């Protein structure tokens, strides 16, 4: 945890242990947030209380799993009803979230099929409001303006009203807390929108994207205050 502000921000990554780009993103985010000279980090620490989980699934990561923990469970299908036996990782984090509350949340992943950086939201939750949705779409627009590595044309199909899967963290947090929650997806090989023949989608680009996400969060918060 870090920060002196009252905006409760949760950043968490690698629910699926095979998606190592998520933890590279986290390294970039933590390098930014802990830099005493970084002006974006200083402003964010003044406005926010950050709760950061760099690796939600350390057992699965250590064992070389693709999508599951040591019990063989997909953690991102446990957020509606986590248990100590099947998903202690989610249980611990969600209990901590219940204590702090959540106002902004980003769940960091990688996608094998879509060669792009994109966000997935919470459109199908039962308590959806246009006002909450507008907060998410506004963050999308800010991030798209800040980095050419991000785009909004490609991504997952949007859930129909009332059909969101509440076992997934983004939907659960938006429904449970009224949070502006989102899932960030990155490619495995390269970003077709800005390909790099030498390195593809690299650890360095993951870390730079994290900095752009944090700068976007600061702009998003400043607009909220206006």
Sequence positions of predicted segments:
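His/Asp/Glu-rich mid-to-C-terminal helical/loop segments that flank catalytic regions of hydrolases
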Residues: 193-226
């Amino acid at each position: 945890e870090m920060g002196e502000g009252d905006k409760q921000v949760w950043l968490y990554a690698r629910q699926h242990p095979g998606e190592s780009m998520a933890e590279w993103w986290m390294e970039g985010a933590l390098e930014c947030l802990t830099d005493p000279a970084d002006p974006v980090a200083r402003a964010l620490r003044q406005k926010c209380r950050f709760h950061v989980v760099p690796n939600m699934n350390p057992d699965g990561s250590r064992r070389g799993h693709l999508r599951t923990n040591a019990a063989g469970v997909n953690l991102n299908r446990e957020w509606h009803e986590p248990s100590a036996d099947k998903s202690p990782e989610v249980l611990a984090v969600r209990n901590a979230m219940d204590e702090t509350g959540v106002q902004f949340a980003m769940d960091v992943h990688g996608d094998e099929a879509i060669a792009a950086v994109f966000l997935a939201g919470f459109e199908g939750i039962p308590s959806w409001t246009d006002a909450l949705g507008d907060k998410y779409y506004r963050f999308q627009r800010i991030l798209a303006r800040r980095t050419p590595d991000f785009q909004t044309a490609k991504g997952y199909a949007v859930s129909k009203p009332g059909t969101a899967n509440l076992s997934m963290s983004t939907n659960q947090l938006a429904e449970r807390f009224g949070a502006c929650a989102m899932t960030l997806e990155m490619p495995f090989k390269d970003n077709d929108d800005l390909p790099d023949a030498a390195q593809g989608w690299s650890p360095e680009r993951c870390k730079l994207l994290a900095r752009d996400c944090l700068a976007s969060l600061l702009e998003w918060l400043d607009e909220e205050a206006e």
